[in-house]
Amino acid sequence: MEAALLLAKLPEAYQIFDPLVDVLPVIPVFFLLLAFVWQAAVGFR
């Protein structure tokens, strides 16, 4: 019974992380840009 009560409260607990979840899909794009900038810095060796 306690586990079901805990699961019911989880969405409320995750509301704090909503902005973080909105940002998460963008992170791979930043890695792609970082790789491009790094290659530009070393002169595309």
Curated annotation (Swiss-Prot):
Belongs to the PsbK family. InterPro entries: PSII_PsbK, PSII_PsbK_sf. Signal peptide: none annotated. This is Photosystem II reaction center protein K. GO terms for cellular component: photosystem II reaction center; plasma membrane-derived thylakoid membrane. GO terms for biological process: photosynthesis. Its main location: membrane. One of the components of the core complex of photosystem II (PSII). PSII is a light-driven water:plastoquinone oxidoreductase that uses light energy to abstract electrons from H(2)O, generating O(2) and a proton gradient subsequently used for ATP formation. It consists of a core antenna complex that captures photons, and an electron transfer chain that converts photonic excitation into a charge separation. It comes from the Bacteria. The keyword Membrane applies. Residues 1-8 form a propeptide. It is a single-pass membrane protein. SUPFAM superfamilies: Photosystem II reaction center protein K, PsbK. It is found in: Cellular thylakoid membrane. Pfam families: PsbK. Keywords: Membrane, Photosynthesis, Photosystem II, Reaction center, Thylakoid, Transmembrane, Transmembrane helix. PSII is composed of 1 copy each of membrane proteins PsbA, PsbB, PsbC, PsbD, PsbE, PsbF, PsbH, PsbI, PsbJ, PsbK, PsbL, PsbM, PsbT, PsbX, PsbY, PsbZ, Psb30/Ycf12, peripheral proteins PsbO, CyanoQ (PsbQ), PsbU, PsbV and a large number of cofactors. It forms dimeric complexes. The chain crosses the membrane at residues 24-44.
